[in-house]
């Protein structure tokens, strides 16, 4: 993944050895934050199959959410998110134990955009039925447009900019001054 380093320049991003774990934690917290920001009572849970339990203030349903997070390099930005078949079974069992409806949240950091999608597990399986090993959440532009148009899929996104990073000016400061 390369960050914008100004006109015609790219800053190479080198991920840490624990980046996958950190990405997973970040995805869980981003979803938790977004839910809380919009009035959902919610909590992180350490349980096989789900990561978050939330009460939806719009429907009053209790959601058991399994969060899948990925950080993509520049070459992988359109790559699908693989969801192994056993993840669906584990989410279903956990939700049965807690009396909640199974949901999935998919968080992908790709390029300058971090995208999040929250939807019922049943909708994931309708869009992308289980294959031999699992399901694949597609991340190409046509699919992103379909998700944004689908009222059953909640979508949020962060646009990211690294302005300066350890002595390397990435984006000129005056490029952001006009936003104020």
Report the location of each language-model feature.
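Mixed-charge (Asp/Glu-Lys/Arg
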Residues: 1-48, 55-180
């Amino acid at each position: 993944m390369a960050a914008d380093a100004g006109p015609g320049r790219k800053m190479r991003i080198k991920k840490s050895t624990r980046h996958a774990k950190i990405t997973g934690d970040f995805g869980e917290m981003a979803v938790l934050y977004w839910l809380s920001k919009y009035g959902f009572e919610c909590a992180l849970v350490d349980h096989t199959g789900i990561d978050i339990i939330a009460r939806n203030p719009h429907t009053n349903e209790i959601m058991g959410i399994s969060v899948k997070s990925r950080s993509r390099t520049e070459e992988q930005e359109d790559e699908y998110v693989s969801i192994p078949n056993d993840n669906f079974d584990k989410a279903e069992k956990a939700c049965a134990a807690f009396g909640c409806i199974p949901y999935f949240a998919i968080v992908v950091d790709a390029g300058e955009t971090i995208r999040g999608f929250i939807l019922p597990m049943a909708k994931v399986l309708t869009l992308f039925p289980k294959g031999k090993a699992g399901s694949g959440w597609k991340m190409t532009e046509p699919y992103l447009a379909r998700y944004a148009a689908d009222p059953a899929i909640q979508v949020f996104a962060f646009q990211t900019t690294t302005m300066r990073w350890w002595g390397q000016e990435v984006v000129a400061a005056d490029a952001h001054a006009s936003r104020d």
